Every structure is written in structure tokens, then in C-alpha cells.
Amino acid sequence: MMWQKYAGSRRSMPLGARILFHGVFYAGGFAIVYYLIQKFHSRALYYKLAVEQLQSHPEAQEALGPPLNIHYLKLIDRENFVDIVDAKLKIPVSGSKSEGLLYVHSSRGGPFQRWHLDEVFLELKDGQQIPVFKLSGENGDEVKKE
């Protein structure tokens, strides 16, 4: 008969091996998706603008110490939030002297408009807060707070 298995023919994989294979496959898939989401956020304008502000802020640079390291977002943190018009992030940063979190609040007028920063501040591990950027003025003038 056509469906009969013969000695040496291809047999189905044992259950344990199948579970192991699928576990490795799904874990690898999850890792790739997690990496791609991180990459998506790090290329977004709200993220880039905040990092540029941090890199150009002398007091924050002095507090962290060179070289400045920007770490991956913790995606499971509920305070990291992005929707159509608002983005609120906690970006882990570190340097040779200290480490901390860069708090970012960014917004835009609508889905296809450009992101702009509302507020960026650095909170160091010891609790010190350094204002890096704050949007001020009724007309939306961007003013650094140093």
C-alpha cells in the first residue's frame, strides 16, 4: 500500500525532539521580533531628537561622563508608550561616571505630521534630575533649558 512505512523510510520526529525544535524556533522568532521593534524605535524621529539633545547638552554629558552609551528600551515597561500623536519613553543611558534614564515626551499634531519634542530630562541613578529640553512659548518655540 502507498501509505505503508517501510524500514528505513522517513518517520515522524519523536515528541520530545519536536517540542525542542519548536521551542528553539519560536524563541528565535521572538528574539528577532524584539530586535526589530527595538530598531524601529531607535530609528524613529522622537527617539533621535531626544538623543541629539542629550548629546549636545554639556551638563548631562558631564554628569554621565564619556563615552555616552544609549541602551535598548525596556519594551515591557508600561511607561514606554507610543501612539499616533504621543510618545513617552524612558531610554536607559550610561557613561563612565554614572547611569540613568532619559525621559522623553514627544508629540505631533496628527498621524502624518512631524514629531517634535515637548520635554526631555535626564534622571541619574542617584535621583538627580537634569532638564535637557523643554518646549516653551505659546507659538511652540523650541527653547533649551540648561
From Swiss-Prot:
Membrane-spanning ranges? 15-37
Gene Ontology cellular component terms for the protein in this record = cytosol; mitochondrial inner membrane; mitochondrion
Q: Which residues lie on this side of the membrane: Mitochondrial intermembrane?
A: 38-146
- What are the UniProt keywords, alphabetically? Membrane, Mitochondrion, Mitochondrion inner membrane, Transmembrane, Transmembrane helix
> Can you tell which superkingdom this protein's organism belongs to?
Eukaryota
Mitochondrial matrix side residue ranges read: 1-14
Any keyword Electron transport? no
- Report membrane topology: Single-pass membrane protein
Q: What InterPro entries does the entry give?
A: Coa1
Main localisation: mitochondrion
* Localization per record: Mitochondrion inner membrane
Q: Which GO terms describe its biological process?
A: mitochondrial cytochrome c oxidase assembly; mitochondrial respiratory chain complex I assembly
Q: Which pairs of Cys residues are joined through disulfide bonds in the record?
A: none
Task of the protein: Component of the MITRAC (mitochondrial translation regulation assembly intermediate of cytochrome c oxidase complex) complex, that regulates cytochrome c oxidase assembly. MITRAC complexes regulate both translation of mitochondrial encoded components and assembly of nuclear-encoded components imported in mitochondrion. Required for assembly of mitochondrial respiratory chain complex I and complex IV. As part of the MCIA complex, required for efficient assembly of the mitochondrial complex I.
Quaternary structure note:
Component of the MITRAC (mitochondrial translation regulation assembly intermediate of cytochrome c oxidase complex) complex, the core components of this complex being COA3/MITRAC12 and COX14. Interacts with COX17 and COA6. Part of the mitochondrial complex I assembly/MCIA complex that comprises at least the core subunits TMEM126B, NDUFAF1, ECSIT and ACAD9 and complement subunits such as COA1 and TMEM186.
PANTHER family under this entry?
CYTOCHROME C OXIDASE ASSEMBLY FACTOR 1 HOMOLOG
Q: Which family does it belong to?
A: Belongs to the COA1 family.
Record's protein name: Cytochrome c oxidase assembly factor 1 homolog
Q: Which organism is it from?
A: Homo sapiens
Q: What is the lineage of its organism?
A: Eukaryota, Metazoa, Chordata, Craniata, Vertebrata
Q: Which gene encodes it?
A: COA1
